[in-house]
Amino acid sequence: MVRPRRAPHRSGAGGPLGGRGRPLRPFTARAARSRSWPASPRGPQPPRIRARSAPPMQGARVFGALGPIGPSSPGLALGGLAVGEHRLSNKLLAWSGVLEWQEKRRPYSDSTAKLKRALPCQAYVNQGENLETDQWPQKLIMQLIPQQLLTTLGPLFRNSQLAQFHFTNRDCDSLKGLCRVMGNGFAGCMLFPHISPCEVRVLMLLYSSKKKIFMGLIPYDQSGFVNAIRQVITTRKQAVGPGGVAGPVQIVNNKFLAWSGVMEWQEPRPEPHSRSKRWLPSHIYVNQGEILRTEQWPRKLYMQLIPQQLLTTLVPLFRNSRLVQFHFTKDLETLKSLCRIMDNGFAGCVHFSYKASCEVRVLMLLYSSEKKIFIGLIPHDQSNFVNGIRRVIANQQQVLQRNLEQEQQQRGMGG
């Protein structure tokens, strides 16, 4: 055993550590205020959450890989964060209040009904850290979210302040139920109300069933995290079927579901100048780790088929685009027809209604017959692309009008 250097108190058997290691120093509020800590290795952080830089929580390590948090996980691994065992004896109470959430009832009861739960809880931080909770509400409302939906938020999780949550054992059933649910792959999302004057807008709660601890993560990039978590919640609601029963998480070829809805278009018919309306349930996927804000997207997208040869002038704008993958389901005959048309030199132009409040105004849909996939291109320069595609459509309409006039003239001459 290494002998401690200049211990201020003798660490005998009756010491705070039972005769092993350096004893705990008695804490006073004055000492905590005057203590000077080195700068955080994470770099300067916004002062709205933490008044000064402080070292990361002891026993917390940041890894590069993402991993699930299951009942057998050795620590908290979401977002590459592994949290070791912590004791409350050397932590400062930062907040006290009530945490409320809704828990699904047992399978033998009504599946659509949820049971409201509430527990008194406290949030603790390390000595020397400052978490401004003066403006926090006395009741926090938590929403339970499957952890596998949060894999795209790894970078935002890594840049977070940690706080340990402790629940008072007044309601053992509620606490056991929360541990059971969160130990089986769920995380807690606490969205602070807009009427609250505090700077924190969202806080995530994770549970380690092995360490028996609850850890709160307060992202420094609150705005980015709020937008990302809203997209996750919206996607989750879209995946919930009738009766509130949620299906498995939609992941195709390591891509994450970003939007679900209906795609509608008009398809040329054999009769001259005749078209038939077609539609298909469609889904948009992005790479894991990417975020596509679709909460303001309409539920139905309207597509116009355009000959690809008319789009050659827009190639520079195509290069500066974001790629997403489209997936269509259900009507196999309609899907085959769409593949045949797009494989014969057509592209799809999806116009967003001006009533929609989203930033995207147009996206292009292309089909690869070799890979059997539909690729969507969302130009970053939306304004110039909209103007360019309008010119293309106007030129196409002029060409069609001239062709129609020529056909009529030929028929008249032949008669």
UniProtKB/Swiss-Prot annotation:
Instruction: Provide the record's note on post-translational modification.
Output: Ubiquitinated by the CRL2(KLHDC2) complex, which recognizes the diglycine (Gly-Gly) at the C-terminus, leading to its degradation. Ubiquitinated by the CRL2(APPBP2) complex, which recognizes the Arg-Xaa-Xaa-Gly sequence at the C-terminus, leading to its degradation.
One cellular component term from this protein's GO annotations in UniProt? plasma membrane
* GO biological process per UniProt: positive regulation of transcription by RNA polymerase II
Subcellular localization, as worded in the UniProt entry: Cytoplasm; Nucleus; Cell membrane; Cytoplasm, Perinuclear region
- In which domain of life is the source organism classified? Eukaryota
Q: What is its main location?
A: cytoplasm
Give residue numbers for the modification (Phosphoserine).
Answer: 53
Q: Please name the Pfam families in this protein's record.
A: Med25
Which parts of the sequence are annotated with region: Disordered? 1-54
- Region (Interaction with FLOT1) location: 184-415
Its job: May activate transcription. Required for nuclear translocation of FLOT1. Promotes cell proliferation.
Q: Which family does it belong to?
A: Belongs to the Mediator complex subunit 25 family. PTOV1 subfamily.
Record-given protein name: Prostate tumor-overexpressed gene 1 protein homolog
Give me the gene this protein comes from: PTOV1
